[in-house]
Regions:
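Secreted/periplasmic carbohydrate-active enzymes, especially glycoside hydrolases
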Residues: 1-154, 158-162, 199, 214-215, ...
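Substrate-binding/catalytic cleft of secreted carbohydrate-active enzymes
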Residues: 129-131, 139-321
Length: 321
């Protein structure tokens, strides 16, 4: 377990002590000088984090000066691994902890009727995560939005994998979703490119310690897409512990860890990549105006519209087949 403590004002004789706990039991410890990463050797029988068993170790990081405790931070950590591998038929699959895992979940834009992008309470943030898990999903794609840290903590604790988008910018090249892109990449201004890289790196750094984060998604449907292969590799180099979905829905390039297709409303897999995992990143868009639950009755959205819950259920079962 790799721990970095930022203590710019630590005294020369200071040291960082790390304790990893399973309940009341200490499972690993480490000591390091301020500014030097601590490496805690986890036991061979360590407990792994997954949607079925989202185990979190308690973590205590203490700044010492001689025998005196100067400061102490309590947090948590988890042990898990996101990767891809070929199955018995040679098809590249997404994996968690070296086992194939079919990731299935909603495209979550984080809208709230009264606060738009701001949830009314922390309980509301957690409620969404809990309901997502109760409905049988094991992941959420956090679409073109970055949430407060509490939302990711709830995902850590309840066992929801997160595919995290970079919020999309305007502009971009022609969108070619049903083929590999054969056009010219969009040219951002130097200022725009610098802003993108700075903000994307800050997002990755902000969420790096959340075990729920499994996939980074720098681009969506060609919005603001530029230098795709280079951005995908830069993302992977910055954080090799997560998978990189270079462009959800295209434009498609042979880079990153997966090929991500979009097709509305019914699911369809119209491309295949033998070297990467092929996923259906978006489909559905089923809409139904539920009386008594409408914020703006004249502005309901959906790729397809139904009038009764039975119609919605039938379409959902047909699409998920």
């Amino acid at each position: 377990l790799h721990i970095e403590a930022d203590v710019p004002d630590a005294e020369p004789n200071g040291r960082i002590e790390v304790t990893v706990m399973d309940g009341e039991r200490t499972v690993a410890t480490s000591v390091a000088l301020p500014g030097v990463a601590a490496e805690a050797a986890m036991p061979a029988d360590m407990k792994l984090w997954s949607p079925d068993s989202p185990f979190l170790y308690d973590l205590r990081v203490t700044l010492k000066s001689g025998k005196e405790t100067v400061d102490e931070v309590k947090s948590y950590a988890a042990m898990r691994k996101f990767s891809t591998a070929r199955d018995a038929d040679g098809i590249v699959r997404l994996q968690l902890n070296n086992r194939d895992l079919f990731m299935f979940g909603p495209l979550d834009q984080g809208w709230w009727p009264d606060g738009l992008y701001t949830a009314p309470t922390d309980e509301a943030l957690e409620y969404d995560v809990i309901k997502t898990k109760q409905w049988g999903f094991n992941m959420i794609r956090k679409h073109v939005k970055v949430e407060p840290a509490r939302w990711y903590t709830h995902c850590d604790r309840h066992g929801i994998i997160v595919w995290q988008d970079m919020p999309s910018s305007t502009g971009g090249p022609q969108w070619q979703m049903e083929q590999y892109f054969d056009g010219a990449e969009w040219q951002r201004s130097p200022e725009s490119e610098a802003d993108f890289r700075k903000e994307w790196q800050e997002i990755m750094d902000y969420l790096y310690s959340n075990p729920c984060i499994g996939v980074w998604v720098p681009f969506n449907e060609a919005w603001g897409q530029f230098e795709t292969a280079e951005i995908a590799q830069w993302t992977k180099t910055h954080d090799p512990t997560r998978l990189v979905n270079p462009a959800s829905g295209g434009n498609h390039y042979p880079c990153g860890d997966m090929l991500d297709l979009h097709h509305y409303p019914d699911p369809e897999m119209y491309l295949y990549d033998a070297k990467r995992a092929t996923v259906l990143g978006e489909y559905g868009g089923i809409g139904m105006a539920a009386e008594g639950h409408l914020w703006e009755p004249d502005r309901n959205w959906g790729y397809v519209h139904f009038k009764t819950p039975a119609e919605v259920t039938e379409a959902y079962l047909r699409y998920t087949g």
